[in-house]
């Protein structure tokens, strides 16, 4: 029921989200380029062989996650999703043809399900604190590991999440593993109600992962 209400809310916002893209494209035409990706339509992208889905929202996260993504690429197919043109351009600049980079679908179950149908990812790694309920819900329904890497939870975000704990905790508990940046961030996730056995302090963006295919 909670995820249904959330999707109804996002559906109401959809026209405004589309208008926002139009206005932003006046300054940066790449906002409207590949617009179909935001709807979960990737006809211009070739299918992959059970890739790891790595989500880094924007330019800063793309740069910070370079070490992890490069390590993953050594032994895995990876698809990187971003939300901004600057992130898209930087990722293409860094990885070239070695990595598939696309816009992430808007956070509606229908759009995310279309992404899964196209790419069939075997794991989802979200960088830092991009907590998208539909993305995580559909991943959970597909029984794949969901990892929050380099996770941080500021005091401001913590207070906001606590106000909606009844909903946020449902999403957080779907993570298989949360790799926190520090003891402070780890403690905030714990106080949110995430089981302590799902949270680890790593202190670095580098980690090893093995995926069963």
Summary of predicted features, one role per range:
Residues 2-9, 13-23:
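Membrane-interacting alpha-helical segments
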């Amino acid at each position: 029921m909670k995820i249904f209400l959330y999707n109804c809310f996002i559906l109401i916002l959809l026209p405004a989200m589309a208008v926002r893209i139009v206005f932003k494209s006046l300054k940066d035409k790449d906002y409207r380029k590949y617009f179909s990706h935001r709807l979960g339509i990737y006809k211009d992208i070739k299918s992959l062989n059970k890739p790891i889905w790595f989500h880094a929202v924007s330019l800063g996260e793309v740069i910070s996650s370079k070490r992890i993504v490069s390590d993953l690429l050594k032994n895995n197919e990876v698809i990187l999703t971003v939300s901004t043109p600057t992130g898209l351009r930087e990722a293409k600049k860094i990885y070239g043809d070695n990595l598939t980079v696309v816009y992430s679908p808007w956070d509606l179950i229908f759009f995310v399900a279309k992404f899964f149908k196209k790419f069939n990812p075997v794991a989802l790694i979200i960088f830092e604190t991009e907590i998208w309920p539909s993305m995580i819900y559909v991943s959970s329904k597909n029984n794949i590991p969901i990892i929050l890497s380099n996770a941080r939870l500021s005091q401001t975000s913590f207070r906001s999440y606590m106000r909606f704990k009844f909903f946020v905790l449902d999403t957080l508990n779907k993570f298989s593993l949360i790799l926190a940046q520090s003891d402070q961030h780890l403690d905030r996730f714990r106080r949110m109600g995430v089981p302590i056995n799902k949270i680890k302090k790593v202190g670095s963006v580098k980690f090893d992962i093995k995926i069963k295919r």
